[in-house]
């Protein structure tokens, strides 16, 4: 339910406020709306890839993206959308994958992977994401959707091994 409240209802209220005050709107979404790709899949997501959300979170983000598109089409709202890959960087919430692993290691707790650790995500630093959003805000075309990524696809086990190495810890 929190995903629906935040991502669907929250987006609705923001869209209505932008419409009421006639301001430009930029909606930040996730690449998770497109579903999953295997690490060795030769295809990449594009702005025209059909949505295939695989979790309540990604479904709620897909719904919010569609609300933005409807407000653009119906009300002429000046808006853009970006779908970004996984962010990492300073001050990230500890429940997120990278800070959770680092915190566990620092506390002497064995890091945990869910499943096999083979699920793949593209990773982008928060500063790079912010720069991309700024480019969209200053140069993007109203009504367009932009994918933001870093071509940094790695599975979770690889990311965890990188963290362990950087922290001087044994992979086992």
Residue ranges and their predicted role:
Residues 3-4:
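A hydrophobic alpha-helix adjacent to the NAD(P)-binding/active-site core of NAD(P)-dependent oxidoreductases
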Residues 36, 52-80, 105-107:
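Active-site Tyr-X1-5-Lys
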Residues 11-12, 62-69, 73, 99-102, ...:
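Conserved active-site helix of classical SDR/Rossmann-fold NAD(P)-dependent CH-OH oxidoreductases
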Residues 34-35, 52-56, 80-97:
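Flexible, glycine-rich beta-alpha linker
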Residues 12-55:
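Conserved Rossmann-fold NAD(P)-dependent oxidoreductase catalytic core, especially the SDR/UDP-sugar
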